[in-house]
Design a protein with these regions (language model features):
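N-terminal secretory signal peptides that target proteins for export/translocation
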Residues: 1-8
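Bacterial Sec-dependent signal peptides at the C-terminal "C-region" and cleavage site
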Residues: 20-31
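Short beta-strand elements bearing conserved aromatic residues within extracellular beta-rich modules
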Residues: 597-600
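Beta-strand-rich modules
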Residues: 620-644
């Protein structure tokens, strides 16, 4: 029989307590494993995209449902409701298509991607205080001096070597009692004003008291995790829960996009009402110690896509990595049945931009290849527990309007395996262009839960993601591209950053019934390094154990393109007896792939006459040289990518045989010969 997908709202997050505490029934029927194959024939492509409206249509912004106040004026928020429900992401198809084949993973070419300074370290995990929920909603951002990681429900600050500097649970961070559930975090670095920005949600699922929390650091130092170090505000959004809030900014505004659900009657499954875009003016100074209450702008209910007919869903503001004055917002037309009765193939991205005056404009849609909501991902060991791959929505966007805005989503691919489609969009005012598009796929694995970011120098991008299959526990992996990479592609190969040690089977997998996909994600992070401008940093999750208790763990990492080293410099030689000692200085190179060996060549005139290879070092001795012959030397550095150019020649040296000094025998002591005494004269007569 044909699959039926029941309407249900997005969820914020689930905590272990929900498994044991009574509450209203969870929504049902969204992921029937038996329905997956029957659903496949419904994946028809649209014959033609709808006509786009005139570009740059101003959007009204009177926010009757939003009011912003300092977080200190909220009083103490109550304990969050215990009603379990799921995000729209759980609409992911639960079944594994019968057309899928399983075979060993095909080896790829040696990857050009590498770790910056070897940085790939564990971050937050489900066992730490405040992190008992699932999924983690892993996110993070890099600044000049720190990497900041956020998960449900904690924040951690690291130095640029990923050593922990400070950590706090969200309730401590914003000054609320222990146990208040704050979730769906977002964190970004604002390079225009040298400060940090955040957004998160008060996850109150039981009544009409709803809050969206936003704020910024008072200085460029994020490590004081309280109101002493941060300006913190809360938008009263009663009665609407602003689910799946996504953060972005330009040089003037903090921008949040989200989906509104009416929480007036918590005894029912509240319906989706509208998407919303909210913006808060940022102080001009990068040192805001007064924390004056800002104004707030927001779209009215009923925000539509560029076709001016269908409701928008999950608008994603761009994390602008420059001083651009226009702040863009992108959204994929809903393929998951969140705003319609059933999942529907889509082929458009909606775009808005907020100008420097705080006016939001509806830009023309961007046509893209038709995409369909993905199937859920299987795991090793043939467990019934599949992994939620979300519902085709965009989850993050990073970049600059001129050099490129990068975004991505998980959609259905060949063999009904999920794939990640990424987009590069350029924009100027209301004019937007799809500059590039590509897909991350695997012949055997499901690929999902991705994040993409350009490099700060705009000379490439990195994408990280999860993948799993019936033969693979979930892994975190990444790929990279540079300016010369062909359109629509990444450089060959991938870098595996972390591998799960077991399949995920936590309490979310059986709520409301066995076979419902395990909550995974719901998103991950990628951001450009403003200091080491060819590096992209990220965070994503993997799993450490099976069982009903969440066992997710975050991995934080820094990625760059591995290149052959530059030529060594300052090559010098000193002659010996039939030998020469050669020294050199390793030249600067991308620290992701240091030299592992050096090749030395001896020259007589312009002709190479001998070579030798040594392990990584800064000196070596060339032996078996001919005395009396003049030599010069060059050095080549070698790493896994390849050799460097040859260095310049050293100074000329001439080995000579050590002079043999003839030391005379020590003098022997001697005396003049003793002559016999003359005979006495004969006696006289």
């Amino acid at each position: 029989m044909a699959a039926t997908v029941m309407g249900m709202r997005s969820a914020v997050m689930l905590f272990v307590v929900l498994l044991f505490v009574g509450g209203a029934p969870a929504p049902t029927g969204a992921n029937d494993p038996a329905a997956s194959n029957a659903a496949a024939p419904n994946r028809a492509h649209l014959s033609s995209p709808p006509a786009a409206p005139a570009p740059a249509t101003p959007v009204p912004h009177s926010p009757p449902y939003f009011k912003i106040v300092p977080a200190s004026q909220l009083g103490k928020l109550g304990s969050s409701g215990s009603k379990p429900f799921f995000r729209g992401g759980t609409r992911s198809r639960a079944g594994v298509s019968s057309s899928a084949t399983v075979s060993p993973r095909v080896a790829t070419a040696s990857p050009k991607i590498a770790l910056y300074n070897g940085l790939n370290k564990p971050g937050e995990n489900a066992g730490l205080t405040g992190n008992a929920g699932s999924p983690p909603d892993s996110t993070g951002a890099i600044g000049p001096s720190n990497y900041v990681e956020m998960v449900n429900s904690s924040i951690a600050v690291y130095d640029r070597s990923l050593n922990l500097v400070s950590r706090a649970t969200f309730d401590t961070f914003v000054g609320q009692p222990s146990g208040v559930l704050l979730c769906d975090p977002q964190i970004q670095w604002d390079p225009a004003a040298n400060r940090w920005l955040y957004a998160m949600l008060y996850c109150n699922l039981s009544n009409s008291v709803q809050r969206l929390l936003v704020g910024w650091s008072k200085t460029s130092d994020p490590s004081t995790l309280s109101s002493a170090g941060w300006c913190q505000f809360a938008a009263q959004t009663d009665p609407y829960l602003v689910d799946f809030p996504k953060l972005g900014h330009n040089s003037h505004y903090l921008i949040v996009g989200g989906n509104l659900y009416n929480e007036t009657n918590p005894s029912t499954n509240p319906p989706f009402v509208s998407a919303a875009i909210v913006w808060v003016p940022l102080p001009a100074s990068n040192t805001d110690t007064n924390c004056g209450t800002p104004s707030l702008g927001a779209t009215p209910l009923g925000l539509k896509n560029g076709d001016n007919t269908t409701l928008a869903f999950t608008p994603v503001p761009v994390n602008t990595d420059s001083s651009a004055t226009d702040g863009y917002v992108v959204s994929a037309y809903d393929a998951g049945g969140n705003v319609t009765a059933l999942p529907t193939p889509q082929s458009r991205l909606a775009v808005w931009h907020l100008d420097a005056a705080g006016v939001l404009h509806q830009d023309a849609d961007i046509p893209v290849t038709t995409y369909v909501m993905p199937f859920s991902a299987p795991q090793l060991n043939g467990t019934i527990n599949l992994l939620d791959t979300l519902d085709g929505r965009l989850t993050q966007a990073v970049g600059d309007p001129v050099t490129g805005i990068w975004t991505q989503h998980t959609v259905n691919g060949a063999g009904n395996r999920s794939v990640v489609t990424w987009y590069k969009i350029t924009a100027s005012g209301s004019a937007t262009t799809l500059a590039d598009v590509g897909t991350i796929s695997d012949p055997n694995d499901w690929v999902f839960n991705s994040a993409i970011s350009p490099r700060f120098d705009a000379q490439g991008a990195a994408i990280e993601y999860n993948r799993s299959s019936l033969t693979t526990y979930p892994v975190i992996a990444a790929q990279i591209r540079i300016a010369s990479t062909p359109a629509g592609q990444m450089e060959p190969g991938e870098l595996v950053l972390a591998t799960s040690s077991n399949f995920d089977s936590d309490f979310t997998c059986n709520n409301p019934s066995p076979g419902v996909p395990c909550r995974w994600g719901d998103y991950s992070a990628a951001s450009p390094d403003p200091v080491q401008t060819n590096v992209v940093w990220g965070s994503n999750e993997f799993n450490t154990a099976s069982g009903s208790t969440p066992a997710w763990a975050d991995e934080n990492f820094a990625l760059l393109v591995a290149v052959a080293p530059h030529a060594p410099t300052a090559v010098a030689a000193t002659a010996g007896d039939g030998s020469a000692r050669v020294t050199w200085t390793p030249s600067t190179f991308d620290p992701g792939a240091p030299a592992t060996s050096y090749k030395l060549t001896a020259y007589v005139g312009a002709s190479p006459v001998a070579t030798m290879t040594v392990a990584a070092a800064t000196s070596a001795t060339f032996t078996a040289l001919a005395d009396g012959v003049t030599y010069t030397f060059t050095v080549i550095a070698i790493n896994p990518v390849g050799p460097s150019p040859e260095s310049v020649h050293s100074n000329a040296v001439t080995p000579i045989q050590a002079a043999t000094t003839q030391v005379p025998a020590p003098p022997t002591a001697s005396r003049d010969p003793v002559l016999p005494a003359p005979a006495p004269p004969p006696p006289s007569r």
